[in-house]
UniProtKB/Swiss-Prot annotation:
GO cellular component, one term: cytoplasm
Biological processes, Gene Ontology terms: translation
SUPFAM superfamilies per the UniProt record, alphabetical: L21p-like
Alphabetically ordered keywords of this record: Ribonucleoprotein, Ribosomal protein, RNA-binding, rRNA-binding
Stated name of the protein: Large ribosomal subunit protein bL21
GO molecular function, one term: rRNA binding
Coiled coil location: none
Record keyword Iron present: no
Summary of the function given for this chain in its UniProt record: This protein binds to 23S rRNA in the presence of protein L20.
Disulfide bonds: none
NCBIfam families per the UniProt record, alphabetical: L21 (TIGR00061)
Originating organism: Opitutus terrae (strain DSM 11246 / JCM 15787 / PB90-1)
Length: 104
């Protein structure tokens, strides 16, 4: 069974056993279980159901495999002939999760 979920400001279509990289869940450790209640749609074929905007009672549970930081993104700004240069870096905090079950 597939489900479309919304978590950490992003939408994903997942099935059981999928591994995703999402924005980090606050105050969680690796090995913790997260329940995602914002399920937008579930099913395949004739069993497909769409929520308005979410399905009541549908829950997707996921296990956090690890918390890590993403690749460094360099933001460089320059204005020609003005002598202005600015270089900043950013690394996004990420969580790697594995979808364990989809309950409708």
């Amino acid at each position: 069974m597939k489900a479309t979920i919304k978590t950490q400001g992003q939408q994903f279509t997942v099935s059981e056993g999928d591994i995703l990289t999402v924005n980090r869940y606050p105050n969680t450790e690796a090995g913790a279980t997260v329940e995602i209640s914002e399920v937008l749609a579930t099913g395949e074929g004739e069993n497909f159901r769409v929520g308005t905007p979410t399905l009541a009672g549908a829950i997707v549970s996921a296990k956090i495999l690890e918390n890590k930081r993403g690749e460094k993104v360099i933001v460089f700004k320059k204005r020609k002939r003005k002598g202005m240069e600015r270089k900043r870096g950013h690394r996004q905090e990420l969580s790697v999760i594995k979808i364990e079950s989809i309950k409708v």
